[in-house]
């Protein structure tokens, strides 16, 4: 029963500690885009790249 206050205080200290990144940021770090944007961008790139040669891929973007 004596350990409970110590345990609670430790939890509060851990929760209020500032977060530290595991890996330092470099100048090359780029924020990630949402996966929906990545898929849309990939389809647009695919359309631009293959449509002049392969017409079946022109309808992949749904438009």
UniProtKB/Swiss-Prot annotation:
> Which Pfam family, giving just one, matches this sequence?
Chi-conotoxin
The signal sequence is 1-22
Q: What GO MF terms are annotated? A: ion channel regulator activity; toxin activity
SS bond list: none
One Gene Ontology cellular component annotation? extracellular region
> Which key words are in the record?
Disulfide bond, Ion channel impairing toxin, Secreted, Signal, Toxin
Which residues are part of the propeptide segment? 23-49, 61-63
PTM notes: Is not hydroxylated. Contains 2 disulfide bonds.
Q: In which tissues is it expressed?
A: Expressed by the venom duct.
The record, for InterPro entries, names: T-conotoxin (IPR031565)
Q: Where does the record say this protein resides? A: Secreted
Identify its protein family. Answer: Belongs to the conotoxin T superfamily.
Free-text function comment from the UniProt entry = Probable toxin that inhibits ion channels.
Domain-related comment: The cysteine framework is V (CC-CC).
UniProt name for this protein: Conotoxin Am5.1
